[in-house]
């Protein structure tokens, strides 16, 4: 019989001592996930191509504890970097890892987004020109960054996640894939078709991996965020690797856009004992979009 003590929030959502890896963990939603895990006491390895971001985040957010942040420089689009990432994690965490958050991603359709309001949707030529606007290269690069890279990072880290599933008794390792509400909604996403399609595919890949990996006691779930401040949505970040969105909260019941606590709470739920019986699911953290 479960005791009342086992149902306290400190027990259910505790990640103290957990080992987590967050790709793209140096800014935006990845940093929000990192903050939540560090606040819960986890050891977090953030992965980025930008060493200056890794060093800055590790220094600033480790000081706030109780967990720790470590940076590993890697481009997850590069198979050699994925291999080096895995080997470094194996050397530093021989008992394995508990949580993998696949978050790194790109959108390369800013120009189409900027012209979405000027498209004549009653003109075949206008629509065709808009749809063809960025060409095949943008599609291929977007799919490579937002889908293919995550598949191969996950595959390479399965042995470490397998080991990690036995670290915490009665628990299992957790993969949390950060997709986007753009992969679900029917709107045009302001013309970011490659981005939206890559995220829809990533959400479905998450379900397939959940079915594939359950014999190893590795869970796979997906978070689809809505409008959050990030370098992708605002174009930049401040000295704390944070971004801001002004005046867009009126359409949400919360009266604001997404914040750190919204991502952190979903990550802690899926990564902790609280989410042990949750697998193959998608959580929409979108304010009701």
Give each language-model segment a name.
Residues 40-56:
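Conserved glycine-rich Rossmann-like NAD(P)H-binding loop of the short-chain dehydrogenase/reductase
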Residues 11, 59, 114-117, 189-190, ...:
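A glycine/serine/threonine-rich, flexible loop-to-helix segment
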Residues 19, 24-28:
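Conserved glycine-rich cofactor-binding loop
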Residues 214-219, 278-280:
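Short, small/polar-rich loop/turn modules that mediate ligand/substrate recognition or access, typified
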Residues 94, 256-285:
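C-terminal substrate-recognition "lid" of short-chain dehydrogenase/reductases
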Residues 106, 112-143, 151, 158-215, ...:
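Catalytic loop of short-chain dehydrogenase/reductase
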Residues 51-52, 73-88:
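The beta1-alpha1 cofactor-binding region of Rossmann-like NAD(H)/NADP(H)-dependent oxidoreductases
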């Amino acid at each position: 019989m479960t005791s009342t003590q086992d149902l306290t929030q400190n027990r259910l959502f505790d990640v103290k001592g957990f080992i987590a890896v967050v790709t793209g963990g140096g800014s935006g939603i990845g940093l929000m996930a990192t903050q939540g895990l560090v606040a819960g006491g986890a050891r977090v390895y953030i992965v980025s191509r930008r060493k200056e971001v890794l060093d800055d985040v590790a220094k600033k957010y480790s000081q706030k504890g109780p967990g720790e942040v470590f940076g590993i420089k890697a481009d997850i689009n590069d198979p050699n970097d994925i291999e080096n990432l895995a080997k470094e994690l194996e050397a530093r965490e021989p008992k394995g890892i508990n949580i993998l958050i696949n978050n790194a991603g790109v959108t390369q359709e800013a120009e189409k987004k900027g012209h979405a309001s000027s498209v004549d949707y009653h003109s075949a030529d206008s629509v065709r020109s808009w749809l063809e606007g960025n060409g095949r290269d943008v599609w291929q690069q977007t799919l490579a960054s937002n889908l293919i890279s995550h598949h191969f990072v996950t595959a390479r880290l399965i042995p470490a996640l397998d080991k990690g599933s036995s670290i915490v008794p009665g628990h299992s390792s957790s993969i949390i894939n950060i997709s986007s509400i753009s992969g679900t909604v029917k709107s045009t996403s302001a013309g970011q078709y490659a981005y939206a399609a890559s995220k829809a595919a990533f959400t479905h890949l998450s379900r397939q991996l959940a079915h594939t990996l359950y014999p190893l006691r590795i869970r796979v779930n997906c978070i689809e965020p809505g409008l959050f401040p990030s370098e992708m949505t605002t174009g930049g970040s401040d000295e704390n690797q944070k971004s801001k969105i002004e005046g867009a909260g009126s359409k949400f019941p919360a009266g604001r856009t997404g914040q750190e606590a919204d991502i952190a709470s979903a990550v802690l739920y899926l990564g902790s004992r609280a989410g042990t019986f949750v697998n193959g699911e998608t959580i929409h953290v979108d304010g009701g979009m």
